[in-house]
């Protein structure tokens, strides 16, 4: 419970202008992009420094008040939903890039810098931050840390964890630590940095981030490859890698995903034909155009072994931007059309055809339609289960059964239930599908060491039986 005394203490720390108790503001900060769920905190604070956050956490720790870190609210797993009320701690004022280190190819940034803003800032110095989530124009770097975000270029360049060198973190008791060192190598003790990445705000609050950068890449070639059968598109993915090509992006989109999105963003009809069940969007990048064209031709020779239609080589910036606009707006297009649930399955890429066929069969069994797309190059398939004309009873009763079977199928294919969206609130009850009791217990013991009073984003990641 937030008493008037506690509220006054929070005001003393951040100032009255940055403490909010009105219903409208609390509701706005009590939702992200997860379905239509709203869980507002009891009070919202907007600190401006690690020191202010430390002072807030000391109060929360003393009075055992839940604290939910809040970023850009673009998440898809309910990670910022304050299901136990308490303090909503918005990081939006920690929004500065502190240093771009051109000598060491590093950047030091605060957590509320928008991912695309950081990418553009380092690009001006001839550097490259590859992590490329679809929400890069609005999501925060801190949120990328919390979820271990990936995106289209993860297939070649890796995900967030591959670029995080060091983190400043405020612990649940208010202590401030650095998790590692600003070095490419570190074999000194347990890796606290990597433990924090993907921890979804359950272990501490990240207040400063040191990221590795790469030299900028100068050129890319983009192919739009239509397939008559969606399982053929899925099968072509591993064949491209087997031929010795590692694309910088390899995206799968089934027909409905493209059709809905083309209307949503007004993409010309030339990119879609009625007889095509799915497309692959394949990019190769590098500094030598001649080599890229050789790689593109090799990809073409691979996919010609499958049932494909005419391939488009996107050779202008307008074409490339339009195709990426199409891909990046699928989730929003689905959201505009119907109520939906989005799952984030990931399997070894060779198993993609089995996963795709299985998902469609499960949908038929339980009476729901799914729209599939995703980062096929790393086996990550987003499954949008859409309500359309399903009854409310069927939506509430049949869909959860189908989701459970989809996750069981994913596990049987040596995959897991989230590739980049995280577990948060909406997936936590499915964790026993992929982890044994022993494995879950080990993870929960780590949580308890960091957070003995269970105040740090409680009710997330672990099944309900663990949150006590």
Residue ranges of each PLM-predicted region?
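N-terminal accessory segments
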Residues: 1-33, 62-65, 302-318, 412-417, ...
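N-terminal flexible segment immediately upstream of the FAD-binding catalytic core
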Residues: 1-58, 75-105, 257-269, 317-341, ...
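FAD-binding subdomain of flavoenzyme oxidoreductases
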Residues: 96-251
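Activity-critical C-terminal alpha-helical subdomain
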Residues: 175, 428-468
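Short acidic/histidine-rich active-site segments
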Residues: 375, 416-423, 458-459
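C-terminal substrate-recognition/cap domain of FAD-linked oxidoreductases
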Residues: 21-29, 215, 224-226, 234-402, ...
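Conserved, mostly hydrophobic/aromatic
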Residues: 60, 383, 451
